[in-house]
Amino acid sequence: HILLSIHRNMMNTCGGVASICRVDKKTGGMSYCGVGNITTRLFKPESVRLVSRDGVLGHEICRPLIKEIQLKRGDIVMMYSDGVVDHFEVKEFPHFYGLASIDIAKISVERFRKSHDDASCVVAKVIYD
């Protein structure tokens, strides 16, 4: 419902993209939904890409789909715009899992930003059991 509301409110604009994650601390479940060229990745021992639906908020979108994934302590959720290259891997970050969320976001934008585009990145670490 949130993405559909954003879509309606962005009509008559240049449009945009968005991803939303909701975490249930009791179950460790994360609900994810995204529209447009925005990347959401879950870093566990391996990297998992969560796929957004095609479209541009405010213009034309496919009906958003909610996906569920299980989180564990130490997992890292990263969401970034298309101004950051999509194909980097954890091995390119020394001490990746030991870094603070803000440092992971900062390094991601500094190292993997496309020179011709704006870039944004949000990182959250799972710290509960």
Regions found by a protein language model. Name each.
Residues 1-45, 113-116:
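Catalytic core of PPM/PP2C metal-dependent serine/threonine phosphatase domains
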Residues 2, 63-64, 105:
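Amphipathic coiled-coil/heptad-repeat helices and related helical stalk/stem segments
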Residues 9, 66-68, 110-112:
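Short, flexible, glycine/charge-rich loop motifs used to bind or transfer phosphoryl groups or to couple energy/partner
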Residues 15-18, 49-89:
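Acidic loop->beta-strand submotif enriched in PP2C/PPM serine/threonine phosphatases
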Residues 20, 68, 121-123:
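Conserved hydrophobic/aromatic beta-strand scaffold that supports enzyme active sites
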Residues 31-32, 49, 76, 121:
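A residue-level structural signature of the nucleotidyltransferase/glycosyltransferase Rossmann-like core
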Residues 39-41, 51-53, 69-70, 97-100:
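Short, low-complexity, polar/charged sequence segments that are solvent-exposed and flexible
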Residues 73, 78-79, 83-129:
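C-terminal catalytic subdomain
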